[in-house]
Amino acid sequence: MSRSETLFANAQKHIPGGVNSPVRAFKSVGGTPLFFKHAAGAYVTDEDDKRYVDYVGSWGPMILGHSHPEVLDAVRSQLEHGLSYGAPTAMETEMADLVCALVPSMEMVRMVSSGTEATMSAIRLARGFTGRDSIIKFEGCYHGHSDSLLVKAGSGALTLGVPSSPGVPAAFAKHTLTVPFNNLDAVRDLLAEVGQEVACIIVEPVAGNMNCVPPAPGYLQGLRDLCDEHGVVLIFDEVMTGFRVALGGAQAYYGVTPDLSTFGKIIGGGMPVGCFGGKREIMSHIAPLGPVYQAGTLSGNPLAMAAGLTTLRLISRPGFHDELSDYTRRLLEGLQQRADAAGIAFVTTQAGGMFGLYFSEAREIVTFEDVMTSDAERFKRFFHLMLEGGVYLAPSAFEAGFTSIAHGDAELKLTLDAAEKAFAALK
């Protein structure tokens, strides 16, 4: 029995499912989840001392690679001054100033401790600002696990949302309206019907929780225009895309300005953190300036601020995101070439330093329906074959992959060599 198998068996005694976040359990791909004990650069090492090229990157934060020395030094330095104060610090202001400088739509910022807190708070703020109750989200998009967002579309063209998880009251879900991603006509029709009741539209500008689905040309600007027409707050959930697809996030990459944005992952440099912000006119409604309540004991935690500030400064150097995107492009081109050579139906997507892999006959991936054409069983086999070859991919056919600046030619060769063998075995 491997060390990971032993640890997983022990973990299940007191941790539900043996993990603290469901995707880690390998339910989508089968087998025993790997337990890691070390990470450095582009690699993670499991409890059995096997090393893997990592394309999960802690689900996005590790854009510099793991254990970047300057980030670790910043955390160590702050560690000597205390873990948490429950009071304002200079670093919080530095972080707010830097985020507002990097993302022009951000005029004011509130720090929180997770992406879920950020999206939950942004939606509450939008409701408080507009005096409206309903929100619009998109099929296949994930915005954290707060009750009003664990909702899927019901039947019919225009319907109230229904809970997608036990424990979410139907009374909460009825205010969440779900429409297809990348379908502007569906949004237009819905707003024509109930626009006066809608507080906000929340969208992942790149849908990263149905693998990686970029927006169709004109889609994000179309949402912007519709929100302006109906007095609806446009929220970009950039927890995944922020500072990754471009330094200014997806909003800079695609040239569309939201009213509010949420961030997480990279902004904490690997520490638990998130933030939301946007127009001063809207953010002024948050307590203590305004009546919309939001608070957090560990918000603006100094260790997280130290890691996040250092990370954001390091990724701000000229050419950083071009290098990241170029590696990702070469990776996907190499995978596509090897899949084609093996006669395997395969298509990839990319947005900067994030990517999607689909075992599909579809010519392109644009909609949720396109995503669902991917052969999940074939992905399972591919995942384990790549694992045997020393490559760690996201353990789900519906999660995005991530590259880091630590990935280079050696990691590319190892990955593509493993993929060539894996594709051959899939015939």
Curated annotation (Swiss-Prot):
NCBIfam families recorded: hemL, PRK00062.1
Enzyme class: isomerase
InterPro entries: 4pyrrol_synth_GluAld_NH2Trfase (IPR004639), Aminotrans_3 (IPR005814), Aminotrans_3_PPA_site (IPR049704), PyrdxlP-dep_Trfase (IPR015424), PyrdxlP-dep_Trfase_major (IPR015421), PyrdxlP-dep_Trfase_small (IPR015422)
Cofactor(s) the protein needs: pyridoxal 5'-phosphate
Main location: cytoplasm
Gene Ontology MF term list: glutamate-1-semialdehyde 2,1-aminomutase activity; pyridoxal phosphate binding; transaminase activity
Modified residues (N6-(pyridoxal phosphate)lysine): 265
Documented EC number(s): 5.4.3.8
GO biological-process terms attached to the record: protoporphyrinogen IX biosynthetic process
Subunit and partners: Homodimer.
Keyword match DNA-binding: no
Name of the protein described by the UniProt record: Glutamate-1-semialdehyde 2,1-aminomutase
Reaction catalysed by this enzyme: (S)-4-amino-5-oxopentanoate = 5-aminolevulinate
Keyword terms: Cytoplasm, Isomerase, Porphyrin biosynthesis, Pyridoxal phosphate
Superkingdom classification of source: Bacteria
Family (UniProt): Belongs to the class-III pyridoxal-phosphate-dependent aminotransferase family. HemL subfamily.
SUPFAM superfamilies: PLP-dependent transferases
Functional pathway: Porphyrin-containing compound metabolism; protoporphyrin-IX biosynthesis; 5-aminolevulinate from L-glutamyl-tRNA(Glu): step 2/2
Compartments reported by the entry: Cytoplasm
A cellular component term, taken from the record's GO annotations: cytoplasm
